[in-house]
Amino acid sequence: MAYSTFSIPKQVIHGNNALEFLSTLEGKRASIVTGGHSMKRFGFLDEAKTQLEKAGMEVQIIDGVEPDPSITTCKAGGAKMAEFQPDWIIALGGGSPMDAAKVMWVYYEHPGYDFMELVRFNFPPLRTKAKLICIPSTSGTASEITAFSVITDTDNHIKYPLVSPQIVPDVAILDDRIPAKMPPLITAQTGMDVMTHAIEAYVSTAADDYTDPLALHAIQLVFEYLETAVNKCDADAFIRA
């Protein structure tokens, strides 16, 4: 008899100031993976670093992850981690830094691993050196709770969807303050991304009694709140989050 699996992080930390959870972690070193400048501009990168330092950790920053992260970026990030030897990998930002951090993690724990094996969904075992925390800055990708990563082969202009329960984050931190900084256009775009994911989940051949209620509720929330979130973003920051 065929069976299904439903993989999500062991912990989902949510609410205002949820970044404070980072101060409770145990370990010696943490690598923060982030994208452009928004997380630094709004102070969340420095706040995450401060919370990790409160936990007694040395912190490495791996920034500049581009939209649609490349194989090259992931390998370079994995090499930097190999030099630093983090106990925790913290992805902070949108889908791109979260997707990149997942594959950097592979190259950190398994240097030289064949990328095409990942494309074939043959992932090596992880968590022998580090665990992964994802902290999203938008509401659209859901990479913080999924087994997916999308990485681009820039030489051949191919985007590869990678899937494995190995890369489901150990912890997702949903701090309301972070996505509340999204401008209206990004709020609209990522809100429709949520709708697309939810509809796909509901009509998927892999849908089941565990996933259907989540998909339907997500669709309902988008219909109820997305217009308000876009048009009244200053007054309804919580809704946008």
Report the location of each language-model feature.
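Active-site segments that bind and position negatively charged phosphate/pyrophosphate groups
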Residues: A201-A241
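Short acidic, glycine/proline-enriched helix-loop-strand junctions
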Residues: P9, A55, M104-Y113
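Short Gly/Thr/Asp-enriched flexible loops that form oxyanion-binding sites at enzyme active sites
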Residues: A76-G78, P97-H110, I145-T146
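A glycine/threonine-rich phosphate-anchoring loop and its flanking beta-alpha core
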Residues: E109-D209, P213
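Glycine/serine-rich anion-binding loops at beta->alpha junctions
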Residues: P86-K102, S137-S143
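ATP/NTP phosphate-donor binding region
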Residues: M1-W88
